Amino acid sequence: MSKYQAIISFEMDEEFMTLVPPHRTYINYLLNKGILDSYAVSMESQTTWMTINANSKIEVFDLLDKSPLSKYWTYEVFELFVYDSQSTRLPTVQLN
């Protein structure tokens, strides 16, 4: 299994906002299943970043296309060579 970074641009309208709750349900499902490692949205730039665990780019495209918001998106997907974050590291040892 590989990690992929999806960079998604979107434009909003009234219908977009009505689809946010079912989209969040889908995102929570992906997070709970360990398919999605991280999810971030900037309303300022109307961009979303997702780090996704999948076997191929095609699988990532299929996952993205299942979102209720997918018709508002244009996106690029890149396979990651390195993925490091605070949450993937062991906790710091604290001596008493």
Question: What are the language-model segments listed below?
Answer:
Residues M1-N96:
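Conserved, structured core segments of small domains
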